[in-house]
């Protein structure tokens, strides 16, 4: 496949992916507004759900903003996977309410986030360690970087959820802390069904799912890298070449 053909294929796939994501997002917004107009939830819940729609758009834009700022290009499959994950987590989970309709939706996403963010870590790891001699040492170093990168992203996501719940505790329940609340006592303390707190259980189970997903993905990848180091190129980032302006012909050349 020629470079131009590859570029055309990439362009078509991205256009289709953007179109599908946009249709799902628009449908989710329309679905949310209709539910609000039917009186299924209050205005605060409408604002909360629409906020996640904005966040979904921002996350998709961030993928290509990173590529633009650092003059890199992620593998096409990774770009599409990141967009799909953003739509599934933020749009599907919140606008369409799949967190409530599908009991395991949250844990499924946290488990799948392990392999997804591991691939991002592998891409950055192969770039950072590109000058390291090939061999078992490099394969282990790249895999370790990807492992820590994935866990770090999972940790930061939990920090984000906690921050949102803390700043706006009335309408947000990202860490399911409201699920275990029975009532409030006269002394100001809360009466809960779970001594450890439902929020703590949700946070730790999310981190464990991310850990398990990361480990299950990276162990076979490490074995593959050790046997065939060239396979690391599957996750390699591409350097975007600067566009060079064509030199204007001199008067003599014009003649």
PLM region descriptions:
Residues 5-23:
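N-terminal membrane topogenic signal
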Residues 231-255:
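Short, highly charged, low-complexity non-transmembrane loops/tails of multi-pass membrane proteins
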Residues 7-11, 41-45, 64-77, 132-137:
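Membrane-interface helix-boundary motifs at transmembrane edges
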Residues 92-147, 162, 166:
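Membrane-proximal helix-loop-helix units in multi-pass membrane proteins
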Residues 40-43, 69-72, 95-105:
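Membrane-interface helix caps and helix-loop-helix hairpins in membrane proteins
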Residues 60-63, 85-90, 150-157, 161:
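Alpha-helical transmembrane segments of multi-pass membrane proteins
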Residues 73-84, 107-110:
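Cytoplasmic-side transmembrane-helix entry/capping segments in multi-pass membrane proteins
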Residues 110-118, 145, 149-168, 172-221:
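Alpha-helical transmembrane segments that form the membrane-embedded catalytic/substrate-binding core
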């Amino acid at each position: 496949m020629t470079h131009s053909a590859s570029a055309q294929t990439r362009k078509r796939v991205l256009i289709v992916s953007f179109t599908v994501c946009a249709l799902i997002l628009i449908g989710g917004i329309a679905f949310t507004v209709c539910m609000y107009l039917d009186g299924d939830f209050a205005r605060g819940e409408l604002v909360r759900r629409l906020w996640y729609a904005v966040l979904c758009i921002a996350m998709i834009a961030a993928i290509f903003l990173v590529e633009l700022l650092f003059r890199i290009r992620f593998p096409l499959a990774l770009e599409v996977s990141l967009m799909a994950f953003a739509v599934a987590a933020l749009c599907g989970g919140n606008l369409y309410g799949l967190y409530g309709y599908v009991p395991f939706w949250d844990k499924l996403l946290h488990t799948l986030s392990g392999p997804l963010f591991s691939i991002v870590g592998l891409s950055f790891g192969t770039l950072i360690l590109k000058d390291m001699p090939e061999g078992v040492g490099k394969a282990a170093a790249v895999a370790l970087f990807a492992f820590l990168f994935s866990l770090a992203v999972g940790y930061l996501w939990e920090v984000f959820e906690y921050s949102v719940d803390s700043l706006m505790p009335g309408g947000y329940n990202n860490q399911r802390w409201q699920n275990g609340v029975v009532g409030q006592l006269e002394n100001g303390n809360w009466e809960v069904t779970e001594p450890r707190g439902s929020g703590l259980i949700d946070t730790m189970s999310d981190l464990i799912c991310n850990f398990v997903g990361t480990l299950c993905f990276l162990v076979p990848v490490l074995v593959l890298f050790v046997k065939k180091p060239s396979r690391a190129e599957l996750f390699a980032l591409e350097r975007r070449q600067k566009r060079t302006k064509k030199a204007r012909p001199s008067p003599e050349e014009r003649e």
